[in-house]
Amino acid sequence: MEDATEMSGGAEEFAEGSKINASKNQQDDGKMFIGGLSWDTSKKDLTEYLSRFGEVVDCTIKTDPVTGRSRGFGFVLFKDAASVEKVLELKEHKLDGKLIDPKRAKALKGKEPPKKVFVGGLSPDTSEEQIKEYFGAFGEIENIELPMDTKTNERRGFCFITYTDEEPVKKLLESRYHQIGSGKCEIKVAQPKEVYRQQQQQQKGGKSNASGGRGGGRGRGRGQGQNWNQGFNNYYDQGYGNYNSAYSDQSYSGYGGYDYSGYNYPNYGYGPGYTDYSGQQSTYGKASRGGGNHQNNYQPY
């Protein structure tokens, strides 16, 4: 219990989810997925409970981006892999009156470390030179993509940065928000095409099974009128995406006995609450480097 007390005092010293996020595509034996959480369980509650099994270096509970309400699941990163084994040895875990379901989080096999990031909330007035200067400070940039609205020929409120290696991405993800130019931007890992396709399929499956029919797909429906928005919504939460897209677990295959409609899991992340990234008020009229077909090239990027 002394260990738990020590952790509860220092639990807020690290940026929530930053260390978990930075290694999401890499195998980390100290990382766990925690399902079945009570909506009332806080990050502090979860950290204090799990600290009895070992030192917790990062912990995050995923929330609805619009309501801020817990989705009932999260991730934890232990300092030592032995702590994960201790958690798994105990057959039953109860927290805040609910049985929780801790599982080992495993990165997808054969997945390369991320070298590309999504930058949301970018002011369309931010010049390409400003973008190069800021992101170049983290490492060597291979490519910058500045998506355009093909109807208005104006810059969108987001961009993509590709580095020559993964180290700059790790550094960037240590902080969720970055001040770039006049705007506060959110940095996420850009999902590869195969993950995007998986998410599309899972979205369709989730909508057909979820209660309320089409009502659950409101965010995606808005995007159908704008291809960029449809692709953007499917970035989900870049730190985690859909659990099965960013991580795999042999015993889950869709997180087993849990009802996705309750978590609204397939629609997690960039939905209606993030349409302010559209840049509709932008006046920056720089032409797209890829011409009229550039939009198709960067979807889902």
UniProtKB/Swiss-Prot annotation:
InterPro entries assigned to the protein according to its UniProt record, in alphabetical order: hnRPDL_RRM1, Nucleotide-bd_a/b_plait_sf, RBD_domain_sf, RRM_dom
Biased composition (Gly residues): 212-224
UniProt keyword annotation of ATP-binding present: no
CDD domains, A to Z: RRM1_hnRPDL (cd12758), RRM2_hnRPDL (cd12585)
Short name of one Pfam family: RRM_1
Main location: nucleus
Region of interest: Disordered: 1-29, 194-230, 269-301
Keyword RNA-binding tagged: yes
GO biological process, one term: regulation of gene expression
GO molecular function: DNA binding; RNA binding
Location within or outside the cell: Nucleus; Cytoplasm
Domain RRM, chain residue ranges per copy: 30-112, 115-194
Cysteines paired by S-S bonds: none
GO terms for cellular component: chromatin; cytoplasm; nucleoplasm
Keywords: Cytoplasm, DNA-binding, Methylation, Nucleus, Repeat, RNA-binding, Transcription, Transcription regulation
Primary role: Acts as a transcriptional regulator. Binds DNA and RNA.
Protein name: Heterogeneous nuclear ribonucleoprotein D-like
Lineage of the organism: Eukaryota, Metazoa, Chordata, Craniata, Vertebrata
